């Protein structure tokens, strides 16, 4: 159940005890005193919200707040900050690295899925989208309310916040750009619990940083998108697959996997040969469910590349190809050690002879095995230094921290 009851005041001594149990009591008491709904440990709602998408890395939050308003988010951020607990928003919860849980144990998780309103202003074409909305809901509401759309990814259950704040690649991206390219503003709760609007005209540095590295900087509670006319024609098709019903349902909830990603320019003949040889060698020898997805990301006719590289923190507009590497096993299985080296080998063989500056990685297809320094460089490239300065300005004590987040220019020790 979601609880709002006021707990008894804790003693000053209990506030400094570092055990997870006492931390939870402190945080829950703070949330309750501020009238912020939260999940009771052991309740069905805790089990639902606290179940990770990637069961290989099952991180456990110290507490789960369930905000319904921006004011709830403000109060929850204050509870975490004042009690030394990192704060992490979770929208759809589909981060491959479980970053919505914090990417590690012990965070105050903000479950945003009760904040899902979508409103279209037909006079301006501007859509207001709450951060807990899923992509399918956003798409259907924009079309229903005015025949409008934004560019976004293909999975309807993915949360809009994490998707938009780090890129938002999908089938429409080649002609319409990334989801973040349609963002014109956002309402953001900062580490000091203040609420600001970020746009080109207001808090422009923060707005630039949100578009590519948003989860490192604050909690966006509301987005403002320009929209375009949805296509008037669509192709209908029917595919009948021989699926096991229960396994199909389970597959939408959780998976057990390791993933990685890559951006590159056009591959040389030697690199193509190396990629294909690895596929037919190591790949064919691995008798389980793995796949590689290669998307035409950039190029001279791409709407992604047409937008200036300095328009946002998204760092890899110039890259032609975007790859996703994915290896999974049954939910109940122990993920095998050879899976890590297998996917890393795929990346290494694809980038044979390639300079570090000629490649990158996509935060929305994260590789959780990367160290923080390497991850920052691979995700944000030449934009990292500016991002670190902005991080230092808005969150110097890293209230919003996870193992691959942007660090401030002068980071503190954890």
Residue ranges and their predicted role:
Residues 2-10, 14-414:
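Soluble FAD-dependent oxygen oxidases
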């Amino acid at each position: 159940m979601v609880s709002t009851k006021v707990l008894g005041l804790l003693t000053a001594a209990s506030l400094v005890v570092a055990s997870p149990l006492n931390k939870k009591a402190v945080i829950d008491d703070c949330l309750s005193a501020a009238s912020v709904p939260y999940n009771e440990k052991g309740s069905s709602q805790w089990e639902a919200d606290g179940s990770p998408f990637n069961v290989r890395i099952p991180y456990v939050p110290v507490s789960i707040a369930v905000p319904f308003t921006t004011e709830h988010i403000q109060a929850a951020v204050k509870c975490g900050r004042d009690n030394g607990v990192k704060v992490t928003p979770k929208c759809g919860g589909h981060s491959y690295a479980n970053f919505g849980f914090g990417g590690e144990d012990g965070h105050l998780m903000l479950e945003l899925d009760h904040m899902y309103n979508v409103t279209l202003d037909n006079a301006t074409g501007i859509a207001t989208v709450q951060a807990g909305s899923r992509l399918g809901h956003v798409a259907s509401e924009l079309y229903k309310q005015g025949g409008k759309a934004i560019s976004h990814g293909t999975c309807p259950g993915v949360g809009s916040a994490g998707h938009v704040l780090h890129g938002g690649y999908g089938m429409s991206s080649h002609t319409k750009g990334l989801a973040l390219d349609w963002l014109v503003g956002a309402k953001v709760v900062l580490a000091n619990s203040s609420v600001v609007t970020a746009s080109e005209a207001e808090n422009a540095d923060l707005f630039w940083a949100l578009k590519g590295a948003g989860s490192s900087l604050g909690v966006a509670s509301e987005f403002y998108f320009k929209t375009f006319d949805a296509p008037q024609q669509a192709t209908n098709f029917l595919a009948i697959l021989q699926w096991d019903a229960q396994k199909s349902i389970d597959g939408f909830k959780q998976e057990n996997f390791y993933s990685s990603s890559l951006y590159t320019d056009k591959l040389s003949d030697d690199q193509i040969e190396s990629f294909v040889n690895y596929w037919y060698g190591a790949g064919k020898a691995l008798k389980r469910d793995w796949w590689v997805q290669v998307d035409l990301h950039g190029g001279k006719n791409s709407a992604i590349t047409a937008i200036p590289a300095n328009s946002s923190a998204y760092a890899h507009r110039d890259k032609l190809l975007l790859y996703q590497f994915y290896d999974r096993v049954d939910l109940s299985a122990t993920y095998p050690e050879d899976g890590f080296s297998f996917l890393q080998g795929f990346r290494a063989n694809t980038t044979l002879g390639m300079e570090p500056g000629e490649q990158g990685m996509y935060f929305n297809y994260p590789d959780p095995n990367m160290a923080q320094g390497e991850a920052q460089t691979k995700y944000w490239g030449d934009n990292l230094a500016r991002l670190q300065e902005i991080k230092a300005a808005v969150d110097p004590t890293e209230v919003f921290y996870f193992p691959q987040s942007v660090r401030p220019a002068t980071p503190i020790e954890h």
